[in-house]
Amino acid sequence: MDNEQPHQELVKCVVVGDTAVGKTRLICARACNKHVSLSQLLTTHVPTVWAIDQYRIYKDVLERSWEVVDNVNVSLRLWDTFGDHEKDRRFAYGRSDVVLLCFSITNPVSLRNCKVMWYPEIRRFCPQTPILLVGCKNDLRYMYRDETYLSYFRDRSPFVRATRKSDLVMPDQARAVARELGVYYYETSVFTYYGVNEVFENSIRAALIARRQQRFWMTNLKRVQRPLLQAPFCPPKPVPPEVCLAASTYEENMKSLWARPVHTDVTLIAGNCTFSAHRCLLAAASPVFHRLFSMELSHELTPRSSSESSMVYASSIRVWEQLKRRSSFQVLPTMDNQRKTYGATRELNHPAFQNIRICLTENANGVQQPMTVVTLSKLITPQAMQQCLQFIYTGSLDKRYHDLQEIRQAAEFLELPQLLMVLGSIQTWEQFVNRDLKTRYKQVVRQRLEDICLEQGLFADVVFDLDDGSVPAHKAILTARCDVMKAMFSGDFRESSAKVIVFPGVREYTFHKLLCYLYTDEVPAISSARCLNLLELANRLCLQRLVNLVESRVIEDLERLSQNEGNEAVENCLRLLEPCKLHNADQLADWCMNHLCVNYNKLCKMSARSVRLLHPENQEYLNEHRWPPVWYLKDYDYYQKCLAEQDRENKPTLKRNRNQSGCLCFSGSSKTRREGSTGNGGATSTTSTETPADRPLFDASTESGEQAV
């Protein structure tokens, strides 16, 4: 041994065990402070031995061998060995101070070999050397079902398989072997670094205690403790699964509505060109269109404002009354007014518009419906109007059109400020600003759609009769955003021509959330107590993104509830678990299952009967994946029992012994021993002054604290 320091104890620690149990990894973790990744741990095993001469070659390895244990300076020298049974290891065993007998927690055969093969071999060459039983790869006791761990085995040879639950050695099984052999038991993991330093510190203690029994005159070893108890390893809390949202199709839906307009209710005439559009979208993008379409065309008065851009000709009270009538789909109050208005043209005092009128047209189903016709002034060219409409629907412009001045003039008259800013960024070549402006425009339009169409109910052309009320909607947006609605309004169903559609089994709260998604591609906050109806409706309409958004909102609500001291989050998860699977909300079901597993003890105390009412597969999953797992709870109870017994042993007795010591042979100590021997059936009693460090390393007559940890 090189570079011995004065007043330093040299401890030779021999590491033995079957091949591929993790001996060399354990030594490298301690001697070289080497941390390994999961991919490195799962590489194909190549038998190796860590060379002992590294203490002489590498200074940092030598310095890491120095350690202070219980105020004793120690230099720990680790000896690696081959795991083959037929190898001759007598040289490695020579002058060893302690032996680590290793096995793999994922290989029960390696534990059996510890008792059958390795322990007899150690005792043959080292009859008095202390032994520690070490379980390696402790991390695989909980990682064997981890998705990251399992993914490494999918693309490998079929002859290489991942660890299964049946392969695992539980702590009580290994401790039973340690108790049978009369040795201490520890567990380690070079992946999590659990127990690495602890096992070597306690191996040093075991070696120093054995050395103290042989060299009783060495005062520096008096305070060395017995190997300490190892706190059980608690697996990390399972991470809640993340919710993955289906890709948004909102922009594609709006582009398709622009490219193939259906259920249009307004026609714009610019020169010799006509453009079909939808009043709700035009009003959401442009305040001037909103004011135009909100006019009461049956009124006989002319516009009151002298401003060219103003088209509000009625008082605010009359406008509010007409908005209420619009929201109930009474565009024209009476049949007489309808007859007067259809075909009648109203001239407008605005630079962008000449006149507006309402006429009757036949839709694709042959049903007559009112159509608003707006004639544009010559200041807005057909090409500029086409670009403005394209921007309103899609948020983008045609790059092939280069006359930006015409578009700018039309945008000013139509009050499209976002389009003006986009044109400015195009002229200055600020593409990144252009992208931000488009994103901001889409947010503004969606917010305006929600306000105009959902809150005020303007420009609707269909009404849904629900269980607790009626809600207006717009066929064009429903058709573009939902394939089921598209089939209903476009096919040979009676709903395609109906003004009122009966929708049984749906309440107004649920349908409003559905419309929020269809119009804005977002879902407002949802209570976990009221989400099932919306999940059922979204699944019925084949809206997977809506299902994902509802899952995300409900999980946010459950996370908020879980921070409270009550059991409301657990109760809601238990209530949602199985219905979520029924409605294909699998991500929410997985999150609820994870939350129930983490709070399994609270769940059983709260409502054990509800757990028994779950589907047997769900009950089995909860029992299998509960956290903390059963083996940890058993190990923790054993650890607490050992600590309690250790405290009782170290606690001084309350009864004070009489001091009967005397001079030489005239003392009463011999009589006291004789009486104690008689009272204990011939067994020698331990005096109260005996310290834990003076007791043997392992007492096979005791059951816990003195045995395997």
Q: How would you name each of these model-derived features?
A:
Residues 1-211, 247, 259:
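TRAFAC-class small GTPase G-domain
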Residues 8-13, 18, 24-25, 61-66, ...:
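Beta-strand-rich binding-surface signature
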Residues 37-47, 52-55, 217-261, 297-364, ...:
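Long, low-complexity intrinsically disordered regulatory regions
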Residues 139, 163, 216-230, 303-309, ...:
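Post-kinase regulatory C-tail/linker adjacent to protein kinase catalytic domains
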Residues 216-277, 390-409, 413, 417-475, ...:
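N-terminal BTB/POZ boundary and linker segment
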Residues 438-477, 487, 498-508, 530-533, ...:
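BTB/POZ-protein C-terminal extensions
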